[in-house]
């Protein structure tokens, strides 16, 4: 009511543990309402591009889609072609946008829409937004935070805060030293899908003032693909849930339910890797039927991007491998041949019966959300029978770390004695996660926005 922030209900997006007591199969989470980006004026050029996997990208083309549209498009589910044609026609024929902004999409969705609406709300109140300004340290006086030190246009400046400083700087996922210190193994900054500049600077500054931390070994995990030439991991959330593939370790054996929520899958990876299971990295295996009809990460379905159009640098055992037979694929990708053949036989039987006797893939509403309802008897399982066969390497990555500064119910940062550090607040991934088990979509952004609101309320003393 008091801003341009607008969200809409996701009626069919289930909780990540929908079969647990209190779980729901939809109508809990929300996504930002799409918005016309030209409302930002020239500030549209300052808006960070969406992660390439939250848009349709091919060459210079960069067409956005919503969460609901993404389910259809990324899964190549019935109706995706009609939806794609509608969105693409509107996008490509937007000549005023092409002339002024190149290939940028006028229609902002997902995170871009959320940020754009926040920016517009600030502009409505004539609030200045400084870009290209990096906080380098906190300024404290007698134990109270009174401002920050920053680097702006290559000049060091001090910014005074008369009422308080709110840290909302993301996690420490791009700092390899902090990853080595806190996160489960294996762990590489290059596997993270997060902002390149999330190096924990605010966390380090608060630690210098004696701030307490918690849950530093947790993250918003997801398997990722390491696309050659890209500096971020490509989150694999949908691909391995679709029917017609399975994921194996170096021995060619499955080790976790591919269709379960992405955080739980990677938690399984870490736990089993620590026990000696060679499952990190792991390998998503699919055949020519899957390849023809479904995308896999940045690899579009063969009907849109045949093998001849795949960049040559992608064909590497650390990313994408191909074999005319499963035995040949095993040799190229470095997977145990006998184990892979045995797994194929098992999965093909499960696809026919509709019941995964090993890992219960397809049993829950979340599993089936990214399945294909046209595939029966199990929307998450289809046989792998027709060569050539493919392997996509998956690494244990994340979209951000989930541990950080300990805060109270007003978002005030606490020290190791449990006392408030006056003038210092935190929200988002630089603070300790409220929902570290990731019970459902929005478990990161929901608390981040809530505690940002609570921090502002405490700082201003407003009763709203």
Task: Show the residue positions of the predicted features.
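Residues forming the flavin
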Residues: 7-464
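Hydrophobic or amphipathic alpha-helical targeting/insertion segments
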Residues: 2-5
């Amino acid at each position: 009511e008091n801003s341009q922030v607008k969200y809409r209900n996701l009626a069919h997006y289930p909780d990540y543990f929908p079969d647990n007591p209190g779980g729901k199969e939809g109508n809990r989470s929300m996504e930002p309402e799409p918005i016309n980006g030209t409302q930002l004026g020239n500030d549209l050029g300052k808006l960070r591009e969406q992660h390439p996997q939250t848009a349709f990208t091919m060459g210079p083309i960069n067409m956005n889609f919503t969460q609901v549209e993404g389910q259809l498009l990324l899964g190549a589910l019935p109706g995706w072609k009609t939806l794609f044609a509608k969105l693409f026609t509107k996008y490509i024929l937007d000549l005023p946008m092409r002339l002024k902004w190149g290939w940028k999409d006028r229609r902002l969705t997902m995170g871009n829409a959320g940020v754009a609406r926040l920016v517009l709300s600030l502009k409505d109140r004539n609030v200045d937004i400084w870009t290209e300004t990096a906080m380098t340290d906190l300024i404290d006086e007698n134990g109270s935070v009174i401002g920050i030190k920053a680097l702006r246009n290559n000049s060091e400046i001090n910014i005074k805060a008369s009422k308080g400083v709110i840290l909302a700087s993301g996690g420490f996922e791009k700092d390899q030293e902090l990853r080595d210190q806190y996160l489960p193994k294996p762990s590489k900054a290059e596997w993270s899908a997060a902002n390149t500049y999330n190096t924990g600077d605010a966390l380090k500054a608060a630690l210098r003032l004696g701030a307490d931390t918690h849950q530093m070994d947790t993250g918003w995990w997801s398997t990722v693909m390491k696309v050659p030439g890209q500096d971020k991991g490509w989150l694999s959330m949908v691909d391995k849930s679709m029917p017609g593939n399975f994921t194996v370790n170096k021995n060619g054996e499955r080790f976790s339910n591919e269709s379960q929520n992405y955080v739980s899958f990677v938690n399984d990876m870490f736990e089993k890797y620590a026990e000696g299971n060679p499952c990190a990295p792991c390998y998503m295996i699919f055949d020519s039927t899957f390849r023809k009809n479904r995308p896999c990460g940045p690899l579009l379905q063969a009907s849109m991007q045949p093998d001849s159009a795949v960049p040559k640098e992608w064909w590497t055992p650390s990313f994408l491998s191909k074999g005319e037979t499963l035995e040949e694929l095993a040799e190229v990708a470095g997977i145990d041949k006998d184990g892979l053949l045995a797994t194929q036989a098992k999965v093909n039987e499960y696809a026919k019966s509709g019941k995964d006797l090993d890992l219960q893939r397809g049993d829950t509403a979340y599993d089936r959300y990214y399945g294909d309802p046209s595939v029966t008897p199990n929307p998450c399982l289809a046989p792998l029978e027709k060569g050539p066969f493919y392997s996509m390497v998956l690494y244990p990555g994340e979209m951000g770390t989930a541990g950080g500064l300990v805060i109270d119910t007003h978002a005030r940062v606490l020290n190791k004695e449990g006392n408030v550090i006056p003038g210092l607040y935190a929200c988002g991934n630089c603070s300790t996660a409220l929902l570290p088990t990731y019970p459902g979509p929005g478990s990161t952004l929901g608390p981040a926005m809530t505690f940002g609101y609570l921090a502002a309320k405490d700082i201003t003393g407003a009763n709203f």
